[in-house]
């Protein structure tokens, strides 16, 4: 309750962002990815360049992945998910960042503060023992296949200026964290709220790629076309999937929860 009170005080009188949504999706995780060979004309209109490689951060990602047994395979439905969202928004009000442009430089650029919604469709890492090793995984190589720092760590997130009305983390277990005495739950949700977002949509367990794409499509249609608030839009989308014989199992839709301001 106290956190919610602080959030409401912080956003009171805040001017709405002028644009609708920034989407970072379908990053390139490996030099073996076919997009490295065909990077000329790669999709994504972000003008930002990849971050300068940082050996310490790359090692941190390696350690974080090793500790939880994570591997970073391409998530094919994240592109479908992102493209579906962007179709709902006028081109002048969106920022698509796909492939190599779905990188750390894009995620940390002040330009993101111009958008009401920031959507990450990629892998997430949650390390409950060492929360400082938690983060969002973005493009790990550049167009030439050269390794680069693509790990948006929890400490990076805390240092962002991201006053978006909503941050969506369409990744696995992004809503979990470590309970630290006197500090509460330390995780990605808290990081993005500290950065300025009053609402963060996250998952509580490993999610199905296709099911998540379907849920996000319905969620954004409810929010952007029917003008429902995020909490109401999520509930409506989940009920629709429950009633759809293709997606009835809660595994496909129940993992996602909205943290923070529900109004």
Which residues fall in each region the model found?
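Catalytic cores of enzymes
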Residues: 1-263
């Amino acid at each position: 309750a106290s956190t919610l009170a602080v959030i409401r005080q912080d956003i009171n009188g805040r001017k709405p962002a002028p644009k609708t949504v920034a989407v970072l999706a379908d990053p390139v995780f490996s030099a073996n990815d076919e997009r490295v060979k065909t990077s000329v004309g790669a999709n994504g209109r972000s003008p930002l360049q990849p971050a300068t490689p940082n050996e310490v951060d790359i090692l941190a990602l390696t350690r974080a992945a090793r500790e939880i047994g994570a591997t970073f395979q391409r998530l094919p439905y994240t592109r479908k998910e992102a493209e579906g969202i962007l179709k709902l928004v006028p081109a002048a009000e969106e920022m698509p960042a796909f492939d190599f442009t779905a990188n750390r430089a894009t995620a940390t650029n002040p330009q993101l503060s111009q958008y009401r919604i920031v959507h990450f469709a990629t892998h997430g890492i949650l390390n409950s023992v060492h929360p400082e090793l938690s983060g969002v995984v973005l493009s790990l190589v550049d167009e030439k296949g050269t390794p680069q720092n693509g790990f948006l760590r929890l400490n990076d997130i805390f240092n962002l200026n991201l006053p978006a009305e909503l941050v969506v983390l369409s990744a696995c277990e992004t809503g979990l964290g470590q309970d630290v005495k006197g500090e509460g739950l330390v995780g990605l949700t808290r990081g993005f709220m500290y950065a300025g977002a009053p609402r963060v949509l996250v998952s509580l367990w490993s999610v199905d790629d296709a099911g998540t794409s379907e849920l996000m499509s319905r969620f954004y249609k409810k929010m952007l076309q029917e003008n429902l608030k995020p909490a109401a839009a999520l509930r409506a989308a989940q009920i629709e999937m429950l009633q759809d014989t293709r997606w009835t199992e809660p595994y496909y839709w129940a993992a996602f929860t909205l943290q923070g301001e529900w109004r």
